[in-house]
C-alpha cells in the first residue's frame, strides 16, 4: 500500500493506542493485507456474537457482493464492501496493482537474467514470418489495452453521478492484466530464440520492445491513486497519457539489419 493509499480516510482501521504504536513501529509485520484480513475477521466475529438477524443478513449480503473477488487482495475486497468516495477508481488501481505485481517481478527478473527458458531454434526461411508474428502480438495487445482502458473502463465506472459496476471493473482490469501477461510472454519468446547467426542483430533489436510497453502499462495504478488521494484530490478531468511506441529510429535499424542479414546469407 502506498503512502497516498494509507492517507485515505476510507482505509482507516480503529486501533487502541498500544496497538496503533505497534503497527506504526513495525509495518513489515503488520502489512495492509494482514490488517484488512483482521478487520474482516473482527466484523464477522462481532456479527456472530450479537446473533442478530440483521447482522446475519448483512454478512450474507457481503458474501454475495464479494462473489468473483475471492482471489482479489484484501484491500480490493474492502473497497467493494465499503464503497468509499471514488471507489471505482481505487478498485481499478488496486486490482491492477495486485495483478501486475507478479508480472512486474518476473519481468525485472528476466532483465537481470535470474531465470531462463528452453531455447527455440528457427531457420532463415522462417525468420521473417517469426518477426512479423512477434510484432503483431505486441500491437494486438496494445490495441486491446487501449480499448479496455478507455471504452471498457469508462463503461464499468458508470456515467457521471452514477455508481459503477464492480464486477465489470474486475473483468476489464483482468483483460488488461492478461494483456500484460501476453506481452511478458512475447518478451520471453524474443529473448530465448536462437536464430541463424546473420539474423542475430535483428533479434537483438526486438529484445526489450514488448518490455517497453509493459513499463508504460505499470504506471497506471500509481497514477490513479495519486489523483484520488485526499491531499491531491482536485475537480476536473484527469488524463493519463501512455506512450506505447518504439525507440527512435528503430524501424529503420530493423530494416537495415534485416537487409544486411539477407545479403550475407
How does the language model describe each region?
Residues 1-12, 23-40:
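Histidine-centered nuclease catalytic patch
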Residues 15:
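The −1 position to Zn-ligating cysteines in a subset of zinc-ribbon hairpins
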Residues 18:
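Short, cysteine/histidine-rich loop/knuckle motifs that typically chelate Zn2+
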Residues 21, 26, 62, 99-100:
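A broad, low-amplitude sensor of folded, mature protein cores
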Residues 21-24, 47, 54, 263:
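Charged/polar positions within long, soluble alpha-helices
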Residues 21-24, 29, 82-89:
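A short, terminal or domain-edge coil/loop segment
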Residues 32-86:
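Domain-exit/linker segments immediately C-terminal to small folded modules
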Residues 64-265:
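Long, low-complexity, intrinsically disordered terminal regions
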Amino acid at each position: 500500500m502506498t503512502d497516498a493509499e494509507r492517507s485515505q480516510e476510507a482505509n482507516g482501521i480503529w486501533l487502541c493506542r498500544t496497538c496503533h504504536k505497534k503497527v506504526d513501529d513495525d509495518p513489515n509485520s503488520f502489512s495492509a493485507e494482514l490488517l484488512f484480513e483482521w478487520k474482516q475477521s473482527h466484523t464477522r466475529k462481532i456479527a456472530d456474537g450479537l446473533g442478530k438477524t440483521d447482522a446475519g443478513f448483512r454478512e450474507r449480503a457481503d458474501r454475495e457482493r464479494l462473489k468473483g473477488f475471492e482471489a482479489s487482495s484484501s484491500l480490493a475486497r474492502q473497497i467493494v464492501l465499503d464503497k468509499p468516495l471514488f471507489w471505482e477508481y481505487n478498485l481499478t488501481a488496486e486490482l491492477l496493482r495486485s495483478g501486475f505485481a507478479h508480472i512486474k517481478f518476473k519481468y525485472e527478473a528476466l532483465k537481470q537474467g535470474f531465470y531462463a527458458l528452453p531455447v527455440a531454434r528457427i531457420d532463415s526461411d522462417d525468420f521473417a514470418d517469426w518477426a512479423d508474428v512477434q510484432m503483431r502480438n505486441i500491437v494486438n495487445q496494445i490495441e486491446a489495452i487501449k480499448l479496455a482502458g478507455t471504452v471498457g473502463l469508462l463503461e464499468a465506472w458508470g456515467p457521471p453521478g452514477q455508481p459503477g459496476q464492480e464486477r465489470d471493473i474486475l473483468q476489464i482490469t483482468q483483460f488488461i492484466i492478461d494483456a500484460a501477461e501476453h506481452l511478458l510472454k512475447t518478451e520471453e519468446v524474443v529473448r530465448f530464440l536462437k536464430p541463424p547467426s546473420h539474423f542475430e542483430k535483428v533479434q537483438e533489436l526486438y529484445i526489450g520492445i514488448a518490455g517497453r510497453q509493459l513499463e508504460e502499462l505499470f504506471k497506471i495504478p500509481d497514477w490513479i491513486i495519486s489523483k484520488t488521494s485526499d491531499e491531491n484530490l482536485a475537480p476536473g478531468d484527469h488524463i493519463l497519457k501512455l506512450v506505447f511506441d518504439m525507440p527512435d529510429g528503430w524501424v529503420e535499424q530493423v530494416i537495415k539489419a534485416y537487409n544486411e542479414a539477407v545479403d550475407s546469407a
